[in-house]
A protein has these predicted regions:
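Conserved beta-strand elements of the Class I
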Residues: 25, 205-207, 257
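Glycine-/acidic-rich phosphate or pyrophosphate-binding loops and their flanking alpha/beta elements
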Residues: 9-13, 155-167, 178-222, 226, ...
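Glycine-rich phosphate-binding loop
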Residues: 253-263
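Thiamine diphosphate
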Residues: 1-167, 171
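Conserved small/polar residues in nucleotide/adenosyl-binding loops
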Residues: 265-271
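Generic long, charged, amphipathic alpha-helical segments
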Residues: 231-249
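Short helix-loop-beta junction
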Residues: 44-50, 215-233
Length: 275
């Protein structure tokens, strides 16, 4: 095992896949000369050249469309959005083309494209850089949505996403790029649509994904001191959702808590849902 930052795991996954398959290329704002806004493509321009690591104009609709169109000629593009907030500029290409090409062509065309970048809140980047979009894309038929919580999952799931023949939304966090974790030395791929039990427990099931998994660990540590055993499930993939893993855990614990990123500091009491 070796220790990598989250951004390094992302870079390693893309680089390994691009060495394996020449039809894969990376495009987006500042991905080449600047090594990516969050340095997730560091060194890739030097290794693969400007034909496969492509700096784009600030025109998300345009380069999202180029990526989707290029899948129809046998390419497998990776598109980096500087933030998924900017994906809204190109959302017509994602929703009305990428997600529907296979069906609209009667199966004649696949659309193996990965749209990746940070989502949700970040450090002092204001409202237009801070919205979470996983639920938006997860409600669109034809898309797969992955939100990893650590470097190990990020690398294994990104490699799977790149090899997938359908469009994948791969969401990261600006607050996690420096997080470190152990990653195997050799190649590995994690299956899309399979949740992971990060911590076994017996009293309550805690379900979350992405950066909020770290908060789940903190809560579980506090509850453990009170004699309450938490089972933490990391969804990893929001669509397709691994509901079976969650149900099996709830059958054991009979209690379920779902953690999401909301404005807890402005609430008199925590959010609850009865029934």
């Amino acid at each position: 095992m070796k220790t990598l930052q989250f951004r390094e795991a992302i870079c390693e996954a893309m680089s390994e896949e691009m060495r394996r398959d020449e039809s894969i290329y990376l495009m987006g704002e500042e991905v080449a000369e600047y090594n990516g806004a969050y340095k997730a493509s560091k060194g890739m321009l030097d290794e693969f050249g400007e034909k496969r690591v492509i700096d784009t104009p600030i025109a998300e609709l345009g380069f999202a469309g180029i990526a989707v169109g290029s899948t129809m000629t046998g390419n497998r593009p990776i598109v980096e959005f500087m933030t998924f907030n900017f994906s809204l500029v190109g959302i017509d290409q994602i929703i009305n083309n990428a997600a529907k090409i296979r069906q609209m062509s009667g199966g004649q065309f696949k659309c193996p494209v990965v749209f990746r970048g940070p989502t949700a809140s970040a450090g002092q980047l204001a409202a237009t850089h801070s919205q979470a979009f996983e639920s938006w894309f997860a409600n669109c038929p034809g898309l797969k949505v992955i939100v990893p919580s650590n470097p190990y999952d990020a690398k294994g799931l990104l490699k799977a996403a790149i090899r997938d023949d359908d469009p994948v939304i791969f969401m990261e966090s600006e607050q996690m790029y420096g997080d470190k974790g152990e990653v195997p030395e050799g190649e590995y791929i994690l299956p899309i649509g399979v949740a992971d039990i990060k911590r076994a427990g017996s009293d309550v099931t805690v379900v979350s994904f992405g950066k909020i998994i770290k908060e789940a660990y903190k809560a579980a540590d506090v509850l453990d001191k009170e004699g309450i055993s938490c089972e933490i499930i990391d969804l990893r993939t929001v669509r397709p959702l691994d509901i079976n893993t969650v149900l099996q855990s709830v059958k054991k614990t009979n209690r379920l808590v779902i953690l999401e990123a909301v404005s807890y500091t402005h609430l008199t009491l925590p959010t609850t849902r009865g029934g």
